Design a protein with these regions (language model features):
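Histidine/acidic residue-rich metal-binding segments in metalloenzymes
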Residues: 1-75, 87-103
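Generic structural signal for well-ordered, non-membrane alpha-helical segments
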Residues: 3, 36, 115, 141, ...
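Generic beta-strand/beta-sheet core signal
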Residues: 20-22, 56-58, 77-79, 106, ...
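Short, acidic/turn-prone active-site loops that include or flank metal/cofactor-
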Residues: 23, 80-84, 109-111
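His/Asp/Glu-enriched, well-ordered alpha-helical/loop segment
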Residues: 45-52, 94-181
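Short beta->alpha connector loops
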Residues: 58-61, 82, 159
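Short, charged, surface-exposed secondary-structure boundary motifs
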Residues: 85-90, 114-116, 185
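Active-site microenvironment of metallo-dependent hydrolases
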Residues: 148-242
Length: 242
């Protein structure tokens, strides 16, 4: 009932409803044993998927569940590093892509990810999808990079970010392509492969948010990093002491 009410409220506000779905095997099995249906079908039957919904994880979903997600236009936040750290499982990424589910990459949160490194998510998403399918072509570099950009924007309901185009917000990064990591390149697909298999946040030199520089030559411009680190350490000690 609570989820249905939240879904109604989200629809009335034209907001995105975000919830975690089918993250662990134990949770999913318990719900199915009690209700005789998967959590995806339970949510669909209660009208939760009637608006803009972002479902995190979706690890323990079958083909029927994926069809429901696709038909309802539910977007999925795929968080491969968190899923590995917590031992949750491997989401059926290739199957969701094939079914046309809107997919964006996420880091979940610092308690279940630590580094919050989106480049790592890109690589891990591709690797896990390939090993799960036993197929080295199951997911391409272009597909996972799209999940980190256009797909992520679509997943959270933003229609003016995620790519460089006229009228879009100027959210951009600069990558040091002169680094040996990214050579040689004889065609564009090779560069995409280098970005996925060998890229990292260490190769990002500059970041712009809405056209404003927030990282320049590897240094954050809008936060005093030394002060932030000192404050975090101080607060951690106080919290540990109770």
């Amino acid at each position: 009932a609570a989820c249905s009410e939240l879904a109604d409220l989200a629809r009335s506000l034209k907001a995105v409803l975000h919830l975690h779905v089918a993250e662990t095997k134990m949770e999913s099995a318990a719900l199915e044993a009690e209700h005789g249906a998967s959590i995806v079908r339970i949510l669909a039957e209660h009208g939760v998927f009637g608006g803009r919904v972002l479902a995190a994880h979706c690890v323990w979903v079958d083909d029927a569940d994926i069809a429901v997600l696709s038909d309802a236009g539910v977007a999925v936040a795929h968080c491969p590093v968190s899923n590995m750290k917590l031992g949750s499982g491997i989401a059926p990424l290739a199957a969701m892509l094939s079914a046309g589910v809107t997919l964006g990459l996420g880091t979940d949160g610092p308690a279940s990810n630590d580094s919050l490194d989106l480049w790592e998510e890109v690589k891990m998403a591709a690797l896990l999808a390939r090993v799960a399918a036993l197929d080295s072509t199951a997911v391409t570099p272009a597909q996972v990079l799209a999940m980190a950009t256009r797909g992520a924007a679509a997943a959270v309901g933003l229609d003016d970010v995620g790519r460089l185009a006229e009228g879009f917000v100027a959210d951009m990064i600069r990558i040091d392509l002169d680094h040996s990591t990214f050579v040689p390149v004889t065609e564009p697909s090779e560069l995409l492969a280098h970005l996925v298999w060998a890229g990292s946040d260490r190769r990002v030199t500059d970041v712009w948010v809405a056209g404003e520089p927030v990282v320049v030559d590897g240094r954050v411009t809008n936060v005093d990093e030394d002060r932030a680190r000192a404050e975090v350490s101080s607060r951690a000690v106080r919290l540990a002491e109770g």
